[in-house]
């Protein structure tokens, strides 16, 4: 159907690799809808050409250069730059209905049935289930909604500093108004939830349709060995106990995306065991993009509690299983 589309966003070349894997996985599972990627000016011309080979439409979005109220909002709320770029998805009025998907998601089966849902349909956020996670949602493009979201961003900002807080404020009735707008968790399975609720994953994980790689470390931050078809993980990494989705992401990348990057000169040498820090370097263990963000400064107990309540627990660091167990042991002795 040409009036419906899957939409994603990339704000740099690292996330563009995620978008390429997402777009490839949608095509692999034979979607009948169009695929669209919003790209900011930070995406290189070479990477944009690769995006054009996978997506039906590549739309450049520059909030700083826009003539609408998005520019004014950015001047007032500079911290919402990426959020305001994402909100542009509501301006795609050439489509009657869309499904937005973050670039760190991977499609595991055909999900065209999502277009039977109404705005705003989304899955619960694992950190605070009365809020929806904005990594996958069904929406209806509308200039009126777009302008109202910009006004809300300008006047109130976002309670979590990103698009999820803003969208949950705007669509505040999601939790209680209409249960049909609650997507099953399998449409937005958080990779961190596998670690935090393993019994449920063992019972229902086989039904997953979309996996969402939440957290600071993204699939492209890992190192992959094409010979063993496995990702190299640190022993304390939560994903190490169930790396199948991560390996699947990399399999999709090496099969469908890597040849395109090579063809466009973004990868010079894709040998069997290389290391690459930048997009155009030599490779060994396949490792693309930027390193994971540097460790955050230590937080107070109140700040950590606040992050937990916002679904931002540091599962890789202070809030790791080992640290939580160690703390519990001190009380149980």
Swiss-Prot record:
Q: Does the keyword Manganese apply?
A: yes
Q: Which GO terms describe its molecular function?
A: D-glucose binding; glycogenin glucosyltransferase activity; glycosyltransferase activity; manganese ion binding; protein homodimerization activity
Specify the species: Rattus norvegicus (Rat)
Q: What is the name listed in the Swiss-Prot or TrEMBL entry for this protein?
A: Glycogenin-1
**Organism domain of life:** Eukaryota
Report the co-factor binding details: Divalent metal ions. Required for self-glucosylation. Manganese is the most effective.
UniProt entry keywords in alphabetical sequence: Acetylation, Cytoplasm, Glycogen biosynthesis, Glycoprotein, Manganese, Metal-binding, Nucleus, Phosphoprotein, Transferase
What is known about its processing and modification? Self-glycosylated by the transfer of glucose residues from UDP-glucose to itself, forming an alpha-1,4-glycan of around 10 residues attached to Tyr-195. Phosphorylated.
Identify residues that carry N-acetylthreonine: 2
Functional description taken from the UniProt entry: Glycogenin participates in the glycogen biosynthetic process along with glycogen synthase and glycogen branching enzyme. It catalyzes the formation of a short alpha (1,4)-glucosyl chain covalently attached via a glucose 1-O-tyrosyl linkage to internal tyrosine residues and these chains act as primers for the elongation reaction catalyzed by glycogen synthase.
* Interaction with GYS1: annotated segments: 284-316
Localization, per the record, is: Cytoplasm; Nucleus
- Report the main location listed first in the record: cytoplasm
Which Pfam families does the UniProt entry name for this protein? Glyco_transf_8
Residue ranges for the region (Disordered) are 287-316
Name of the gene encoding the protein in the UniProt record: Gyg1
Concerning its family, UniProt says:
Belongs to the glycosyltransferase 8 family. Glycogenin subfamily.
- An example Gene Ontology biological process: glycogen biosynthetic process
């Amino acid at each position: 159907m040409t009036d419906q589309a899957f939409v994603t966003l990339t704000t740099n070349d690292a996330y563009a690799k995620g978008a390429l894997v997402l777009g490839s996985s949608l095509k692999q599972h034979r979607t009948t809808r169009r695929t669209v990627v919003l790209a900011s000016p930070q995406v290189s011309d070479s990477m944009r050409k690769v995006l054009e080979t996978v997506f039906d439409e590549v739309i450049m979005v520059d909030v700083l250069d826009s003539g609408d109220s998005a520019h004014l909002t950015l001047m007032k709320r500079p911290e919402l730059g990426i959020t305001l770029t994402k909100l542009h998805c509501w301006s795609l009025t050439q489509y009657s209905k869309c499904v937005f998907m973050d670039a760190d998601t991977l499609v595991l089966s055909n999900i065209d049935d999502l277009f039977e849902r109404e705005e705003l349909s989304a899955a619960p956020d694992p950190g605070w289930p009365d809020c929806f996670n904005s990594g996958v949602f069904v929406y209806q493009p509308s200039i009126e909604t777009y302008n109202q979201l910009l006004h809300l961003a300008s006047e109130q900002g976002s309670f979590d500093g990103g698009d999820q807080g803003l969208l949950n404020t705007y669509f505040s009735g999601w939790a209680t108004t209409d249960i049909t707008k609650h997507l099953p968790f399998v449409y937005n399975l958080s990779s961190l939830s596998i670690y935090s609720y393993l019994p449920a994953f063992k019972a229902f994980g086989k039904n997953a349709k979309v996996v969402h790689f939440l957290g600071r470390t993204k699939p492209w931050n890992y190192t992959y060995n094409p010979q063993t078809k496995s990702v190299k993980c640190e022993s304390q990494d939560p994903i190490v106990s169930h790396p199948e989705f991560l390996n699947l992401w990399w399999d999709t990348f090496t099969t469908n995306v890597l040849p395109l990057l090579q063809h466009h000169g973004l990868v010079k040498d894709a040998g069997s065991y290389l290391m690459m820090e930048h997009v155009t370097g030599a490779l060994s263990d396949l490792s693309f993009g930027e390193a994971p963000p540097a460790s955050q400064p230590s937080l107070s107990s109140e700040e950590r509690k606040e992050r937990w309540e916002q679904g931002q627990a540091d599962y890789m660091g202070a809030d790791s299983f080992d640290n939580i167990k160690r703390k519990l042991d001190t009380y149980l002795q």
